[in-house]
Amino acid sequence: MQQPCVIVGSKYCSPNPVGLAIVRKVMKITDGNFVITSADGKLLFKVKDPLFSLHGKRILLDCSGAKVLTLRGKMMTMHDRWQVFRGGSTEEGALLYTVKRSSMIQLAPKLEVFLANNVEEKICDFKVKGAWLDDSCVVYAGDSDTIIAHMCGKQTMRGFFFGKDHFSVTVDKNVDYAFIASLIVILVEIEKAGFITKMTTQMIIGF
């Protein structure tokens, strides 16, 4: 991308492509922690799950522990809609963007991203295609075929819930990599919530 794509902050944009290494270590069946580093191992972000939150909330911290973003999904809609706020606030004025599943009948989530000023949400500002468990996902600018980031890795169902997953993300030059990191985290959370809902429904029907 030629023009800088600044969503979270200009300091997260580089004139060269940025490689991110992401590790997700599962602590419990319902939550996990992410560690995000540069390709050469420098710590960039951590993602923490606050205890006893009334919403599905995740906090993106920088290497110093400062709050960069708050990711919030309502408990009844965590499988299809999340809001992302600047810093540690969840006030309306701190809203940066909303991420939602474009269709509830999709086997693999296709996500649409709407910036805070896109209140009508008719045309998305970004979109994400692919799935964590499919080992690949791609982030596009707007409703176009322009790729601004892509993820690859090797996940297993066991690792998804009980182990440790490693994967890499390549972010295009001039693209906000804090923004991209948050989209990958939300993609995983949406997949996880949808899978748990599906399994719970099957168990109830089975009984």
From Swiss-Prot:
Disulphide linkage map: none
Pfam families registered for this protein in UniProt: LOR
Gene Ontology terms describing biological process: defense response to fungus; response to salicylic acid
Record's GO cellular component terms: mitochondrion
Knockout mutant characteristics: No visible phenotype. Reduced basal and R-protein-mediated disease resistances.
Tissue: Limited to discrete pathogen infection sites in leaves.
Highest rank taxon of the organism: Eukaryota
Inducers of expression: Up-regulated upon infection by oomycetes, but not by bacterial or fungal pathogens.
UniProt xrefs under SUPFAM superfamilies: Tubby C-terminal domain-like
Family named by the database record: Belongs to the LOR family.
Described function: Involved in basal defense against virulent oomycetes. Might be related to the phospholipid scramblase and tubby-like superfamily of membrane tethered transcription factors.
Name of the protein in its database record: Protein LURP1
Organism: Arabidopsis thaliana
